[in-house]
Structure formats: structure tokens, C-alpha cells
């Protein structure tokens, strides 16, 4: 027979493992289990299809609430609740203004259930130990995901064969079947946060587990450079990492730090100069496809968004070929909300959510300033800078980057809460 104390310890271990499993399930579900498992069409296809992770987030939220009998709301709760109220109201507008079907509108909102994971992860992160476990889970997930994506890139470039379960754009499948691949979107959301988490653990100084952090970091960087290949994304990452390093090493400037900064600056220069030149060439070339579409989209949406200022055009994109599709996507069907940052937020969700988005960024920085732990402050600022630098090109309200926003809110909230607890306990 087990004593009461032994039963209590046994239940505690089971309780802890259950919570850990819930978080692990969420992390691997974002990439649809590293894109290895074939899922029904409703959940599969392009990497930006976040229907599956939305439903998993709902399940994880309910499961965590049942297991813990509580939910920690944190410092972003009012912003998240406002977003949900807005989406509910916007759904009514879409229904009666554009005559979309109720099922289409509601189905399109499923990815936003991902914000429930803010509460779920907050409930899991109740102390420093749980945060270390969370970071370790992120690192292992990053290692497996990055290896899968890098191997897929290698195989595709050599054999033009996809073994992972995501759909490539028409550029590859229809027009340039033998072209070398770049898999835009598959690394847009989770990896951009994971690379900062890995760098945070490298900066932390503890040798234990640093090998995992370094492996995760290098693989994530390789993923961003070789798999995603977005010039702006690479620049965002370098800037965020640079500021993280400066903040973490504040008051510790010595010869080693100066040498590291010099080496970092040299490597960054080698990486960034071609990217800057490429961006400048693109901006100067009005006939460049992506540049033409982005500038055209901004002018197009701004020309009439005043008529939809408080509601936006909505999140639902009608079927191609319909008049409503070409109204949303432009006459050529080439304009996208997710290509134009906050202009896309304004076009799709209106002025209220544009203000909401800016308030989130401001809150990120305000909370980051309050954090006392140097390395946690560096991580919080890295997350804040990553979001800020993508303001005109990569909105965190786009489907593939919703997880970036959820993890940014969650991590900054935890670090700020820990600092507040330490102040009171001190």
C-alpha cells in the first residue's frame, strides 16, 4: 500500500507529465506533426492552413482547464478578449454585407482559436522550472522540424519529389516544375520565435543543455536562410539577435564580448549586404512580381477601405472566379492581405484592429522594460523587435504567424510576471 505522501507525489508527477504532454502536442501540431503525417484535405494543403492547430488549441485549452481546475489569464487577456469580440461582430458583417455562408465564415475563424493557447501555456508556466521545460520542448521541436524541412529541400532540389505533406505554390507545380525550391510559409511562424528561444538559452550561460540550444539555433538559422529564403525575414532575425546579445551582455563588456560583436557584425554584413542590395533592386524595379503586387495591393485597398473602415473586408476569401473574389483580391487576383503587413490588417480587419495591433507592440515593449532578469529581458526585447520590424511586411495576424503572436505574448507575460514576483518576494 502506498502512503498518502507517496500517492500525492505520484499524482503530482502524473499531473506534471499531462501538462507537459499538452504543450508538446500543441507545438508539434502547428507543423501538422512535422508535415510527416498525411491529414485530410480540410487540414492539409498549404502551410498557412491552420485549421488543424486551431482545433488542437481548443482541445488543449479544455484539457488543461480540466486538469488544473484553473486558467491563468495574464496581462494580455483584455486584448485577446477584444479580438474575439471583434471577430464575432465582423462575422455578422460578412454574413449580411457579402452574403457569405455561415459555415464558411465560422470555419475560416477556426485558426484564431490558437489564442486559447495563450491561456493554456500561461497556466503551464507557473515557475522557472516549467519555463525551462517549455524552452527545451521548443528546442527539440525546432531540431526535428528543421531537419525535416532541410532534408525536404535537398531532396526536392535534386529529385523534385515531396515527401512532406504540404502543397507548393503554382509557381513550382505549374510554371517552373524543374526549379529549385524555396518553401515560403513553412518556417514563417514557429521558427521565427524558436530561433530566439534557442539564442536565449545560449546566452543563459549554463553549460548543461547548451549543446541542444546551439543545435536548435543553427538548424533554425539554416531553415530561415535556405528553406524560407525571405530577405526581410533574414534581416529581421539578424537585427533581433543582435539586440538580444547587446541587452544580455550589458554591463559585461570585455574583450571577449567586443570580439564577439565584431565577428557578429562581420557575419551580419556578409549576409545582409546582398539582401539589402536585393531589396533595393526590387524596390527600384517596379516590374518585379512581388514588389508590383505589394505596392499595387496597398494602393488598391487604400482606395476604398474608407467604406469599410471599422469592419475591414473580412477574413474570408471567396472561391476563385467569383466577382467577390476579384473584389477582395483585385482584378488580377494577385493581391494578398498577408503580403503588406499592417496595411493588410487595415484592409482585412479595419482601423480598430490596426490600433489593437499597435497596442500589442507597445505593450510588448512596456512589459519588456519592466523585466529585471537580464537574459529574460533580452528575450522579451528580441521578441518585441522581431514583431516590430515586420510591421510593414509580416503581420502576426496572418494565419502562418498567429503562433508567433501567441508565443510572443506568452513568453513576455511570463518574464514580466516572474520579475514582479521577485520584486514582491525580495
For the regions a language model picked out, list residue spans one by one.
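N-terminal signal-anchor transmembrane segment
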Residues: 1-68, 86-94, 230, 387-389, ...
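Loop-to-helix entry and N-terminal half of a specific, functionally important transmembrane alpha helix
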Residues: 20-28, 218, 366-393, 408
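Aromatic-anchored transmembrane helix interface
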Residues: 76-88, 98-123, 133-142
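Membrane-interfacial helix-loop-helix modules of multi-pass inner-membrane proteins that assemble, modify
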Residues: 97, 146-188, 325-333
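Hydrophobic transmembrane alpha-helices and their immediate junctions
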Residues: 135, 140, 211, 242-249, ...
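Long extracytoplasmic/lumenal interhelical loops at the membrane interface
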Residues: 281-349
